[in-house]
Curated annotation (Swiss-Prot):
InterPro entries: Ankyrin_rpt, Ankyrin_rpt-contain_sf, PRANC_domain. ANK repeats lie at residues 6-35, 39-68, 71-100, 103-132, 137-169, 174-202, 206-238, 242-271. This is Putative ankyrin repeat protein FPV234. It comes from Fowlpox virus (strain NVSL). Keywords: ANK repeat, Repeat.
C-alpha cells in the first residue's frame, strides 16, 4: 500500500502492527482518517483487510466515513466478505448504509452467500431488505443462500425464511427458483425447504420446472440432483411451454434407463400420473426407443409379482397385496398403520422389486407424510372449531373434505398455524 505523508505512514504502521495506542495518539493529534491513498484505498479498508477491529473502531470514532468506497468495495461489503461480524456491527453503528448497492450487490446478497448466519441476522437487525433484487440478474438473497454448499447453509436459509424471505421467489431476469442455484441438492435441504412451503414443481421461464432446468444445465453431479428431486416429488412428467417433459430433454444414456424405469413404474402404480399428457409423451419415447423399451417388460414382471406379494402384519389385511396398497391413495391410513411392517420387509422388497424399488419407497414416504399432515390438521381444526358447523359434521365427512386438499395446501395450512402460534406467543 503506497502512502503520501507522514501521518498516513504512521497510521498504516499502527494498523498493520495492531498498535491501538499509537493509532489513537495519531488520530487525536488531528490526522485525517479519511485520506485516500492511491487507487482510492482508505485506512478503513486497510484495517478491515487486517481484521483489526480495534483500529476500525478508532477510525470510526475519529470520523472515518463508514461508506467510503471510491474504486474499492464499500467497508461494510468488505467486512462481510472477510467474515468480520464485530467489524460489520461497528460500521453499522456508525452509519454504514445497510442496503448500499455496489457492483449490483447489496450487503445482504454477499452475507447470504457466506457461511456465517450471524452476519445475516445483524444486517436484518439494521434493516436489510431480505427480498431485494441484485442489480444484475434480479436474484434475491435466498438465491445466494442456496448457492452455498456448506453444512451451515440451512442456518442461513432458516434465518432468511424466519424473517419473511419467499422460498418460491423467482429471479427477475432468468425466472428461476432459488433451488436452481444449488449445485449439490441434498435430502436434508429438500426436506427443510419443502416443510417451509417450497414448491419444487413451480414453473419458471418457458414453463419449465426444476427438472427441466437441471437437465438442460447438464452440469457436474446433476444426475444425483435429479434423483434426489424425484425422490421428493419433482414431476418428471411436467410439460413446458414447448410441450417437452424433463425426460424428453435428457440424453439417451445409462442414466436415462434409470429414469425410464421410474417413469414406467409410476405409470403402473399411479392413476393420476398415468392419465397425464406428460406421461403419455414419456411412454411413447420409451416404447419407440429400443435402448429404453426393454425396461417395460422388466417393470411389468415386477408389477405382476407385486400383485401376489401380500402385506400381512399378523393381525389384519391378510389379502392385501403390495400393488393394492401402493396403487390406491385411499389406502393412506393403511400405509400408516402398516409402516412398521413395511419397514421390516423393506430389504425383501428391494431384493424382489429392484427396478421398482425407488417408486415404492417414494410412494410409501409420500403417503405416510401426507397422512401425518392430515392428522395434524384434523386435530387443529377439531380443537379450534368446536362451536362451528365443522364440528357438527360426521367424522367421516370431515376427513373426506381434508383428503381433497393437495399436499401443498396442507403444508401451507400447517405453516400458517405455526406462524399464528408464534404471533400469539409474542403478544403474551
Amino acid at each position: 500500500m503506497q502512502v503520501r505523508n507522514k501521518d498516513d505512514i504512521l497510521i498504516c504502521e499502527a494498523i498493520e502492527n495492531y498498535d491501538s495506542e499509537s493509532l489513537r495518539n495519531i488520530l487525536e493529534n488531528g490526522a485525517d482518517p479519511n485520506v485516500r491513498v492511491p487507487y482510492q484505498y482508505s485506512h478503513l479498508h486497510n484495517a478491515i483487510e487486517k481484521k483489526n477491529g480495534s483500529a476500525v473502531s478508532l477510525l470510526l470514532k475519529h470520523g472515518a466515513d463508514p461508506n467510503i468506497s471510491g474504486f474499492f468495495t464499500p467497508p461494510l461489503h468488505k467486512a462481510i466478505k472477510k467474515g468480520c461480524v464485530d467489524i460489520a456491527r461497528s460500521l453499522l453503528e456508525y452509519g454504514a448504509i445497510v442496503n448500499l448497492e455496489h457492483y449490483c450487490l447489496k450487503p445482504i446478497h454477499i452475507a447470504a452467500n457466506r457461511t456465517e448466519s450471524k452476519i445475516v441476522k445483524l444486517l436484518i437487525e439494521y434493516g436489510a431488505d431480505i427480498n431485494s433484487e441484485d442489480g444484475a440478474n434480479g436474484k434475491y438473497p435466498i438465491h445466494y443462500a442456496m448457492k452455498v454448499y456448506d453444512p451451515f447453509r440451512l442456518k442461513i436459509i432458516k434465518v432468511l425464511l424466519d424473517h419473511g424471505a419467499d422460498i418460491n421467489k423467482q429471479s427477475v431476469l432468468t425466472n428461476t427458483s432459488p433451488l436452481y442455484e444449488t449445485r449439490f441438492i441434498t435430502d436434508d435441504l429438500l426436506d427443510y425447504i419443502i416443510s417451509r412451503g417450497a414448491n419444487i414443481n413451480i414453473k419458471g421461464r418457458m414453463g419449465r420446472n426444476i427438472l427441466h432446468e437441471i437437465i438442460l444445465r447438464n452440469g457436474y453431479n446433476d444426475f444425483s440432483n435429479i434423483l434426489v428431486l424425484i425422490d421428493h416429488g419433482a414431476d418428471i412428467n411436467a410439460l413446458d411451454d414447448e410441450g417437452n417433459t424433463p425426460f424428453m430433454l435428457h440424453t439417451i444414456n445409462n442414466n436415462a434407463i434409470i429414469l425410464a424405469n421410474y417413469i414406467v413404474s409410476l405409470y403402473y402404480l399411479s392413476y393420476k400420473a398415468r392419465i397425464s399428457n406428460g406421461m403419455e409423451k414419456n411412454m411413447k419415447i420409451i416404447n419407440k426407443c429400443e435402448y429404453l423399451s426393454s425396461c417395460i417388460n422388466i417393470i411389468k414382471e415386477e408389477i405382476e409379482r407385486m400383485k401376489t406379494f401380500k402385506i400381512y402384519d399378523g393381525n389384519s389385511f391378510q389379502d392385501l397385496s403390495l400393488f393394492d396398497l401402493l396403487s390406491n391413495e385411499d389406502n393412506i391410513a393403511i400405509v400408516y398403520r402398516l409402516s412398521d411392517t413395511l419397514l421390516e420387509k423393506m430389504n425383501i422388497i428391494k431384493t424382489i422389486f429392484p427396478n421398482c424399488f425407488r417408486i415404492i419407497q417414494n410412494i410409501l414416504k409420500m403417503l405416510t407424510k401426507r397422512y401425518e399432515m392430515l392428522l395434524e390438521i384434523n386435530n387443529i381444526m377439531n380443537a379450534n372449531l368446536v362451536n362451528t358447523k365443522w364440528y357438527t359434521l360426521p367424522i367421516e365427512i370431515r376427513w373426506m373434505i381434508l383428503t381433497k386438499l393437495d399436499d401443498m395446501i396442507l403444508r401451507n395450512l400447517l405453516l400458517q398455524n405455526e406462524t399464528n402460534n408464534i404471533k400469539n406467543c409474542k403478544k403474551q
